[in-house]
Amino acid sequence: MKQTIKKFSRHRMERSSLCFLTILIIVSFVLQACAPNVSAGNLENMITPLVPTSAPAPTSGRPEYGPGELVDYIAQSGDTLPALAERFNTTVDEIMEANPIIPLDATTMPPGFPMKIPIYYLALWGTAYQSLPDHAFVNGPSQIGFSTSAFVASTNGWLKNYRTYAGEKMRTGAETVDYVAANYSLSPRLLLALLEYQSGALTQPEIPAGKYLLGLKRSFYEGPYLQLVLAANTLNNGYYSWRAGKLTEFELLDRSLIRPDPWQNAASVSLQYYFSRLYAGDKYHASIGPEGLARVYQNLFGDPWLDSTIILPGSLQQPALRFPFLQGHIWAYTSGPHTGWGSGEPYAALDFAPASDVSGCFTVARDLYTTAMADGLIVRADIDGVILDLDKDGDERTGWVLFYLHTATDSRIFVGKEVKAGEPIGYPSCEGGSSTGTHVHVARKYNGEWILAAGPLAFNLEGWVTGGGELAREGTLTRGALVVTACECSDFSTQVISEVSSK
């Protein structure tokens, strides 16, 4: 039987928080001390053509644990208690009981933190082999200094001379990879490795015949660029579903069931999920094993596991944020947690719409502009979104950034502009992405990783905290006893007022 624990006193919570912080600091120092100096991989003579081959089906090799048996687990970047509970088929309460040092208000676990987790065994757990670290998955700090254009120019594959129309302009193959990498916040190295593994993009002179280069069959998504878009979307679906504790099982093309090993990391599970959409049997197991994509990545860019970069540190906290509209104004909360970019996970975004007597797409009054939710520097501003960099280092791949979508072109702020909280970003509109009505779409990223809008690191806007629903776009904003429910209907129950003055 699963057990629950009693409520903890404030004294225990404060003591646990202090002890947990101490361990977090110690673990951080140890990890930094062990971090090697990693240089960019040699761009010459590293490309090894590889196609999917046969391999036996690997298993996790885990024993049939007794119900509630305590197992050892070392926390990984981005781990949260709710997700760990889903992965190990247990409860947050039981994890807390087994690890009393963890405070009740814990967000992310400190990477390297040793834990005991009560496990409830499930059959068909997959391989324990980890093919890619999380920092090599996202478009984060580990990608700084890497030039996709220079790398592709040093190769002899078809991508070098590829040209396509993407994002309202003609782009080279390298520019196309960077465009997809920026929008989905995915590592350009990973996208290049995927293109090489599945199509020989860096070693073969000709593009493989057929409409669906990567094997992802969907109407109107033909050709390398749109296939790469589908691949990026699928990868994000897998990565962030694992982050949220939702991807505990999936099927291969032959309908065989896979349950990712609970000890897995998000990037490796994402690749397992991605290849499950394409293959079955030996071909699937080869693609996720050491001789599959992982080998191609290492041949191209070196061993990613030598880089000790941590994407999400322990006890991560959101900085103070205000609503994305003027103080004293009332807007409608039109959509709860939904995709940050693309479709499906990550459910990182919220939508707000200004008051209006009309529905659909319309031009707003001049005082209904979208505002900065915090002080920062504008590092990207185009139809694909505005990025507000809160640490002002000029790079959206580091630290906290805020993402705005659907700002009108004629009023959009420009790159390089430093803003204070409450200052204009642009007018809400229907421009950019898919939209059925004038609104602004906002999301957060940290070190290149989309931060889920609900959960342990939920949006907190002026004390209003996001709660998720059963489906995308459902959800609430709660402050004390007050609850606002998201609805595209923009009725009275969706209205919320900004009460924080501009600086």
Whereabouts are the PLM-identified features?
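Short glycine/threonine/proline-enriched tight-turn/helix- or strand-capping micro-motif at secondary-structure
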Residues: P313-L316, A320, W331-M373, Y404
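Zn2+-dependent peptidoglycan hydrolase active-site motif and core
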Residues: V364-V415, G437-H439
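Primarily a LysM-type cell-wall glycan-binding module
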Residues: S54-D93, F113-M115, I119, S131-L132, ...
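A structural signal for short beta-strand/turn segments enriched in small hydrophobics and glycine
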Residues: Y333, T370, G376-I378, G416-P428
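Ser/Thr-rich, Proline-interspersed low-complexity disordered segments
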Residues: I26-F29, C34-E69, P100, Y120-F137, ...
